[in-house]
Amino acid sequence: AGVIVDSEVARAAAEPVLPVRRPLPGFAAHVADAALREEPAAQRHQLTIDRGVQERLERVAKKAAARIGPKVSVAIVLARADTGAILAKAGSADYFDAARAGWIDMARVVRSPGSTLKPFIYGLAFEDGLVMQETTIEDRPANFAGYRPKNFDMEYQGDVSVRQALQLSLNVPAVRLLDTVGPVRLVARMKRGGVTPTLPEGERPGLAIGLGGVGLSLEELVQLYTGLSQRGRVARLHSRADAAAPKPPGEPILSPQAVWQITDILSGVAPPQGAPRLGIAYKTGTSYGYRDAWSVGYDGRHVIGVWVGRPDGGAVPGLTGYLAAAPILFEAFAKSGLGIAPRPRPPAGAVRLARAELPFAQRRFAPSARESADAPVEPAPEIVYPPQGARVDLGLRAGATMPLALKINGGRAPFRWLANGRPVRLSARRRTAAWTPDGAGASTLTVIDAAGRAASVNVFLE
């Protein structure tokens, strides 16, 4: 009593109460969630987030998802390439959008990266002196012990330069180079950059990893690409400003000369339709079945990564990195307000030579001895049960947990199973298996054999 005078009480009581619902604050929600999980007892959290950049990129993500379609989410990560500090991160299109599962931080979810690892394959080839930018390499049908990669458009370009092969993201040339430099070595370089790619349990890295046959998150991809911005030196991503920045990995992921060659090529990739030429270097990727669209770009100071897809792993017909993710990448760079930083000067020993100036051995890349054009191969895998379009009553609506029998013909073990784009732990050697679904509804089942060949069926489980 006596704290507030009667006149003030009367005035406050006379104020009208407006029935207005105000939106919940959702600023940098996924970053805030992570900070609270890491330091739940802390009274104050100091983050590396730049408020202005964060707000602008959250708007970019939300508008892009609405433009692309329902149930689609967008994740964007912007980081300093030299320190790894995350300046902005939208883990989804809208944290409170239940239809897009906005509460899931898609920047940390492991997905297939599509072709976004190809620059590192070419980097190893440059480092080893196997090729230069104008080296001729074949883009023709090839057989690598039963693995027959095809280009995204199912067409072949014939003889192309290494520069063209990377800019066009041709699959066969990338696999040819990976077959020579070695998939185990590629994975080792990723680990050198502080990233551990996810492989099916018990499997060794194979040629398919160059085309997306491995699991990485958007944050991990952005971390790898900091090395392309900084002459091979990778910076570990972090979002806390009130703790010591994590120590960078020791050795460079690639030599400065190899990184310069990659950046020189990727900076010449045409921007997506309607986007301005910003002077950035960038690469796109699309996962198997149109489930994930990626684009990662960088200048001399920042790296931005974009992921587009459905959080439930469902396919989005026509969703590609170039058509869906790249326009968002360019918009994010343009609207970040950070400008475009010049790239480092060419390091000593970095040269760009015409084909006629190359040593004879570097004018054409020779296929490895393991590559064959006509080696016999067993039939591709086929899912014979359940058949395409089947409706299978497992009693799920009544609360039962009956498994679904799976059977395949053809293909070569070991096999990998995916349910709605996510790995399922089943026997890798047997052609029959039993899978217990999470619930009723439509499901897409995919099997991938040792040669990277895949078969899928869409079924409805009841």
Question: What do the predicted segments below correspond to?
Answer:
Residues 4-10, 100-103, 126-144, 181-188, ...:
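Short, well-structured active-site flanking segments
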Residues 22-37, 131-186, 245-268:
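Conserved catalytic neighborhood of penicillin-recognizing serine enzymes
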Residues 280-462:
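Soluble, non-transmembrane domains of envelope/secretory-pathway proteins that act on or interact
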Residues 47-68, 76-80, 89, 97-106, ...:
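A penicillin-recognizing enzyme superfamily signal
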Residues 1-51, 55, 150, 191-202, ...:
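Non-catalytic, structured segments within soluble enzyme domains
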Residues 33, 79-95, 126-130, 142, ...:
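Glycine-rich, acidic and aromatic/proline-enriched surface loops and short helix-turn segments
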Residues 57, 84, 105-137, 165, ...:
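Active-site SXXK
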Residues 49, 74-75, 137-142, 153-197, ...:
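Active-site-adjacent helix/loop patches that line small-molecule binding or acyl-intermediate pockets
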